[in-house]
Amino acid sequence: NLNDPDTLQRHLDTRFQQLSTAVELELWQEAFRTAEDIHTLVGMSKRAPKGPVMASFYDKMAKVFAVGDNFLFHAAAYGKLYSLHSARLALQGGDAKGEDGELEKLASRVLLSALAVPVGSGVVETGRGRSASADGPTEEGESKGRLGRLASLIGLATPPTRAGLIHDALSRHALKRVSPQLRELYQ
């Protein structure tokens, strides 16, 4: 009975563990299906998962999207992960030891993944020249529906764009945290 909060929480815990295992074993389709299950269960839950659990989720989704050559959502997942880490660091009152180095690495991943999204790809292109609806009919409505599902899977209201991802990275001060070489690459 998923109406019982304890049962729902046990299902969520199981699915998060299943996602971790699927990524560890490189079972990418299973990982994606599990992520969809997690999204559905989180929507049913009255309480949101804790920050570290969601951070792990976004990290795993970044890996899943990278394997699928979905550069746009790979970058978006890293953006969500960076947002969680920087918010946690701000709540801790600034730069905690060891955390700043981790945030620098993550800022680099955010900026690089956003820059790696092909220019002019918009929201339809994903990677290897395929459209986002490569696994089905290429009608615009289905493509938008699939993009909307992918966006909601990682907690976005609308599908991301390359320009939007870069803007978000800059507005979250990722450029200040990356190495001078990466700053130069951006400029």
Segments from the language model and where they lie:
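Extended alpha-helical scaffold regions
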Residues: 1-187
